[in-house]
UniProtKB/Swiss-Prot annotation:
It comes from Clostridium botulinum (strain Okra / Type B1). Gene3D superfamilies: 3.90.320.10, P-loop containing nucleotide triphosphate hydrolases. Keywords: ATP-binding, DNA damage, DNA repair, DNA-binding, Exonuclease, Helicase, Hydrolase, Isomerase, Nuclease, Nucleotide-binding. This is ATP-dependent helicase/nuclease subunit A. SUPFAM superfamilies: P-loop containing nucleoside triphosphate hydrolases (SSF52540), Restriction endonuclease-like (SSF52980). The keyword S-adenosyl-L-methionine does not apply. The gene is addA. PANTHER family: ATP-DEPENDENT HELICASE_NUCLEASE SUBUNIT A (PTHR11070:SF48), UVRD / RECB / PCRA DNA HELICASE FAMILY MEMBER (PTHR11070).
Length: 1279
């Protein structure tokens, strides 16, 4: 069925059978297409066809599952077009709706629902909302701590004193974090107890024989390899330099010592030799012919090695067995208590969920696991009877994005796949043993392996979610590429996305820096990407650009004056980089007529000018950087949108509304109260607030207002308030002197607040918040501000959060505020509401994680000089899935605390894993680019940094591993790799680097390294001659006498402009304006198009009205823009699409009522709907601008004078699609129809300009033009 020309490797991935198949698919290798084609081939196999519901296809996201289902459906439908009578195809199309193409969580949920009777859960369970989960966890941990305090549990008290700092909230955070971490293990309780027992060492404990000792030795050996290279480099210099040969022997001894250490396999011997070694002294010979520069260079290198070896000696000297044993014995009670505390918390949390018949996100996987697993008599974990039934059901299990699997998911998939073996614990770790297991029933026909796993370990970037790339790597290293193996692998490294220039650059860089130590994979020629995309010869590719700027570049006062720039313009680092990027974008886009970059448009099949939407700016994290970049790009007139995950709670409108909720809950809070009083909700001035505070400075602000209110209303003060009034006469005088307006303002606010407090008790929180929006007018006010649409969208998100909260078992304003505060200070903060469509012509800023799976013509990777985030390493207890706990040693009696030995080991392990993750994140970022890649970054002290890079260039094939290990930024990796590239010569010369490189790399990759300074980014210099001319004109005018210019002034003031009529004609018109002009009565003139502006109340102040015909038309057009005809088979499908628009906040529920699913379905089933479905090129809501003669519209103008006058006509084409013999133009109309001819006449001119625009833009013929009339559910053709 497929017309795609597959590569040999892709064909192997599609057609290989009867084995466990691991497909390593590099970036842009078309893995989704291969996976889909494999499924299609399975279900259409002529010899052994498999029904699609007999396949289990596990995807990473719901979107991926939907896309895969859609692709398979399209393929089957195309097959039916070719063979309409095919029963097999019809059957598969029917079964597609109940196919098992889903995320791992959807599959687990399916298992639970089908087998709930085996668990102690109510069949009517529901999945716990995140909101409810947060509140329940907090409630559970608060109750647990209170109970343990009450019974004075000794282990708990010791834990609090050791690890809780001043408040026990820190220990609560440790428990919650460890609980979340343990849930990524298949059997959390077992893992927790095993990790604590790791500290329970006996008298025979020997540290030198432990895994920890081996890890220390292996980590140190990575550094020793670096020292070896440095010493070998020194020896080469000694042998090739004049007069320093007497250094040879001591350097040779040092090198022999390092080589001996590298050969050691025993930690005891390794430690002993390092501690015992003394570096021989260098001879003090003087030789006047000696090469002093070479001598100094080798001495510096040796000193560096000596210093590092001394550091290693000191570390190893502290690893004395008895000391370590005592440390473990001391820590054991605390670690056991911590594990037990987490288990107690989990049980309490579980009880709360069961009370409410809830399960949470983690429960889904663990409940499924418990259903699918059993233990045999040996204690091994084997498939349950239910799992064996799934093995019989599924002919193949296909797993997408396999590199992001965690251990729980791996065990689940192994239970339902036909794999031989069992899981068991060994040294506290869960290990898979590929051996036969005895099952009660023989598994006839189920002994043929049936797992298909596809992914790219170089793109495994979710370790923070406990993804375990080692699962993929273990199979990758174990499986064989040979045919007829039961465990086989196929490599798909041909990239069909990027230009050769991008691929060559990525390959060069990662061959230099990625290794098993950092990246967990050696990036060899075998692992490198291969060019698979063709971009033709019309436009040549460009080199990858690296744009660097020195943070310490100082600008003198003279330069600031020369460029007419304030000292306040001294930009911070992020602004500098943002401005640099803005200038690069301006150069790339050009003026869209010439000078800009040309990119290939796959849809058009040709090159076109680069647009803003083609550009993405990627960042490791967007929280602090994106807003600054947005500001800098906006200053340069570049449309930009930042897709961030933070900052929502910092927006003014949300802060104000949360403050209002806080004071409604409890008005005795000065900061939120003042926030509300200063806001438009209350509109108090600073002077008015000062007057209120003068009542009493020792009570809350609300109490001051309450006293004023009661005395002004002649109400008696109760004893509470009387207590705070020392001098009633003084208070009365203050209130008497207060102006009436302020007193009325206070009374009005107090009365409203009391009303709101009362109302909050009686209605749900979401209703109450919307009531406040309307009552205060704040929703409308926010919409009237700059970026009003964005602000209102943010307020709607708060309302939606409240709506979710209202569905939980928690009620009340107090709990909702607690929940919001919890979100603020956890990872629950989200970015501002998204109000931008996918097709908007803007530059996008997003995190690298969000870009995964996407591609862009131009990628700008920014912030490469920013330090990696290693803050987690500073916590007082670290956790590692394999090594367990890494606590500080805290002796409260002796008041000493320091990192324990095991903490230092785990800290280093986590640091290396974090660096490996960062390496893969960098790989993901660079492989998003199709045609152009730009990298930007700031460097602290350019000269010193580049000199350091040069010192790391001894091996032209690889940046030394020790250097990669010590990297703190992406530039620390990129710089040493590029400095030795042949394209860096001019860069080194620009920096006047005198050090000669013996290892210049002549690689085929193309790079352009630019050095920027702050001067280039300052405002453009004011031309001196312009200033001089201005001054001369001023002097001349001042010297003129009245008689010389009085007559000229009168002459100029009475001047009549020749083109006066043109001054009232707009330079731009919409198509709708043109249509109105043409249907005006002949007596009417052009000016009636532009009526006098009528001021009206803002919508939020007006009474609620019915939706107008104009609004109705807008809503229906919006729906048609987002309508997916492939998913519109019945009215229910259309209702689902309407609901999706409501959820995404494109329309409100009230607005959705104007959309008739019946009428939409009639369109979909009609001739035009079918033609759209059959077209491969459908475009919706396409904006355009075309230039036409002004006389074409304004016929009353003087033809001679205005013959060259032009107008811009702009509009938006609802829909056009392409068929074999031309384009079809379609415009939707919601007007009421009396006369078809009248409608045709009304819109004829509009359609004419749409046709002309399409002809000009696409260069293709418009063969048919239609109006679709929703009022009569039919279309008319425009001739």
């Amino acid at each position: 069925m497929s017309g795609t020309k597959w590569t040999d490797e892709q064909r192997q991935a599609i057609f290989t059978k009867n084995c466990n198949l691991l497909v390593a698919a590099g970036a842009g290798a078309g893995k989704t297409a291969v996976l889909v084609q494999r499924i299609i081939e399975k279900i259409l196999d002529k010899e052994e066809p498999i029904d699609i519901d007999k396949l289990l296809v596990v995807t990473f996201t719901n979107a991926a599952a939907a896309e895969m289902r859609e692709r398979i459906g399209d393929a089957i439908s195309k097959g039916l077009d070719e063979d309409p009578e095919s029963k097999v195809l019809r059957k598969q199309l029917t079964l597609l709706n109940k196919s098992n193409i889903m995320t791992i969580h959807s599959f687990c949920l399916q298992v639970i629902k089908n087998n709930f009777h085996t668990m102690e859960i109510d069949p009517n369970f529901r999945i716990c909302d995140e909101t409810e989960g947060i509140l329940m966890k907090q409630e559970a941990i608060d109750e647990l701590f209170d109970e343990l305090y009450e019974i004075e549990n000794e282990d708990f008290i010791n834990l609090v004193e050791s690890y809780a700092s001043r408040k026990d909230t820190r220990l609560q955070e440790v428990v919650l974090e460890l609980h979340r971490f343990a849930k990524s293990a298949p059997f959390p309780y077992t893992w927790l107890l095993n990790m604590a027992e790791g500290f329970n060492v006996g008298e025979n404990f020997n540290f030198e024989e432990t895994l920890w000792a081996d890890m220390i030795m292996e980590d140190m050996k990575v550094l020793l390899y670096g020292f070896k290279n440095m010493l070998q480099q020194s020896i080469d210099v000694i042998l090739n330099s004049e007069g320093i040969d007497y250094y040879y022997e001591p350097f040779k001894m040092d090198l022999s010592f390092i080589n001996s250490l590298l050969e050691k396999s025993s930690f005891k011997e390794f430690r002993g030799e390092i501690i015992a070694y003394d570096f021989p002294k260098l001879p003090l010979k003087r030789n006047k012919d000696a090469d002093k520069e070479a001598k100094e260079r080798v001495k510096k290198l040796r000193d560096k090695v000596k210093k590092k070896i001394v550091e290693l000696k000191n570390i190893l000297d502290s690893y004395e067995n008895e000391f370590i044993k005592k440390e473990f014995i001391f820590l054991y009670p605390s670690m056991k208590a911590l594990s037990n505390l987490v288990i107690l918390f989990d049980k309490k949390y579980e009880a709360k969920k069961r009370e409410r018949d809830l399960i949470d996100f983690n429960d889904i996987e663990h409940l499924c696991l418990s259903i699918l697993t059993d233990k045999n008599s040996d204690g091994h974990i084997i498939p349950s009877d239910i799992a064996l039934n799934y093995r019989k059901k599924f002919a193949e299990v296909l797993i997408d994005e396999y590199q992001d699997s965690n251990l729980v998911q791996e065990v689940i998939m192994s239970m339902v796949s036909r794999v031989k073996g069992y899981w068991s614990f060994y040294n506290g770790q869960l290990i898979f043993n590929e051996k036969e297991i005895n099952l009660e029933e023989p598994q006839i026909g189920l002994d043929i392996p049936n797992r298909f796993m596809v992914g790219d370990v170089k793109q495994s970037i979710y370790r923070f979610r406990q993804a375990k790339p080692e699962i993929f790597l273990d199979k990758y290293n174990e499986y064989n590429e040979e045919e007829d193996r039961k465990n086989r692998k196929v490599k798909l490294f041909k990239n069909f996305r990027s230009r050769e220039e991008v691929i060559n650059g990525v390959n060069y860089l990662f061959k230099q820096i990625m290794s098993k130590t950092i990246g967990e994979l050696d990036y060899t020629e075998e692992e490198a990407l291969k060019v698979g995309a063709s971009y033709g010869e019309e436009v040549k590719g460009e080199p990858i650009e690296l744009c660097l700027m020195d943070k310490k570049y100082e600008i003198s006062e003279e330069v600031l004056k020369e460029y007419n720039v304030d000292e306040e313009e001294a930009l911070d680092n992020i602004q500098l980089e943002g401005r640099l990027v803005a200038k690069k974008i301006q150069k790339l886009v050009g003026n869209n007529l010439e000078g800009g970059l040309k990119v290939f448009d796959k849809k058009l099949g040709e090159y076109r000018n680069l647009q803003y939407r083609d550009i993405v700016i990627l960042m490791r994290a967007t929280s602090n950087w994106a807003p600054v970049f947005v500001e800098e790009l906006a200053k340069e007139g570049i449309p930009v949108f930042a897709d961030t995950n933070s900052g929502y709670f910092d927006t003014a409108e949300i802060k104000t509304m949360i403050s209002l909720l806080q004071i409604i809950d409890n008005p005795l809070q000065d900061i939120p109260l003042l926030s509300v009083l200063r806001s438009p909700i209350a509109s108090f001035t600073d002077d008015e607030l000062i007057d209120i505070r003068m009542v009493n400075k020792n009570i809350t602000f609300y109490e001051c207002m309450e006293i004023i209110y009661r005395l002004y209303k002649n109400e008696k003060l109760d004893s509470y308030y009387s207590f705070y009034i020392e001098d009633e006469n003084k208070i009365n005088k203050i209130i008497k002197d207060m102006n009436e307006k302020l007193k009325n303002k206070i009374c009005s606010f107090i009365e409203k607040l009391k009303l709101w407090r009362e109302k909050s008790i009686h209605i749900d929180i979401d209703e109450f918040i919307w009531f406040l929006y309307v009552e205060t007018g704040y929703y409308g006010y926010a919409g009237a501000l700059q970026a009003g649409e964005q602000r209102q969208a943010n307020l709607r998100i708060l309302f939606q959060r409240a709506k979710q909260y209202a569905k939980t078992s928690y009620k009340g304003l107090f709990n909702f505020i607690n929940f919001i505060n919890k979100l603020k200070f956890s990872s629950g903060d989200m970015g501002s509401a998204k109000i931008l469509g996918e097709n908007e012509n803007v530059v996008r800023i997003m995190s690298i994680h969000k870009s995964k799976g996407l591609e862009f013509p131009v990628v700008i990777l920014s912030g490469t000089g920013k330090n990696f985030n290693m803050t987690d390493l500073n916590k007082n207890i670290l956790f590692h899935r394999d090594l367990g706990y890494g606590p500080d040693y805290v002796d409260t009696e002796r008041r000493i605390a320091y990192p324990s030995l095991v903490k230092n080991i785990i800290k280093n392990k986590i640091r290396l894993e974090t660096l490996s993750e960062e390496m893969r994140i960098l790989y993901v970022a660079l492989t998003r680019a199709r045609e152009k890649l730009i990298i930007t970054g700031l460097i602290n002290n350019m000269d010193k940094t580049v000199e350091d890079w040069l010192n790391l260039s001894e091996d032209k094939n690889k940046v030394p591993e020790y250097a990669v290990m010590s990297g703190k930024t992406y530039l620390d990796w990129i710089g040493p790799a590029l400095i030795k590239h042949k394209d860096a010569v001019s860069f080194r010369e620009e920096l006047k680097m005198t050090s000669e490189l013996s290892n210049i790399v002549d690689d085929k990759s193309k790079w352009k390294i630019e050095l920027w300074n702050k001067r280039e980014l300052l405002k453009e210099k004011v031309e001196e001659d312009e200033v001089e001319i201005s001054e001369k004109i001023k002097e001349t005018l001042m010297s003129l006498e009245e008689s010389n210019y009085k007559e000229e002034i009168y002459k100029r003031l009475s001047f009549k402009y020749k083109y006066d009529n043109a001054s009232s004609i707009p330079t731009k018109l919409s198509v709708s304006d043109v249509k109105k002009q043409f249907i005006l009565d002949e007596k009417e003139n052009t000016e009636e198009l532009f009526k006098k502006l009528e001021l009206r109340k803002p919508m939020f102040m007006e009474e609620k009205k019915k939706i107008s015909p104009s609004e109705r038309g807008t809503i229906i057009h919006l729906f048609m823009q987002h309508l997916d005809l492939k998913k519109a088979e019945n009215e229910e499908d259309i209702k689902e699409q309407i609901n999706r628009l409501i959820e995404r906040e494109f329309i409100t529920y009230e607005q959705s009522k104007v959309i008739s699913p019946y009428k939409i379905l009639k369109f979909c089933r009609g001739e035009l709907g079918k033609r759209i479905l059959n077209s491969n090129n459908v475009n919706k809501e396409m904006p355009f601008s075309i230039e036409i003669p002004a006389l074409e519209i304004y016929k009353e103008l003087d033809k001679e004078i205005y013959k060259n006058e032009k107008l811009i006509i702009q509009g938006v084409i609802d829909c056009y699609f392409e068929e074999e013999d031309g384009l079809v133009l379609l415009d939707y109309k919601t007007d009421y129809v009396n006369d078809i001819e009248e409608i045709k006449n009304r819109y004829e001119i509009q359609i004419k300009y749409y046709e002309e625009a399409l002809n000009r833009i696409t260069g293709k013929n418009v063969k048919d033009k239609y109006l679709y009339l929703f009022s009569v559910d039919n279309y008319i053709k425009i001739d």
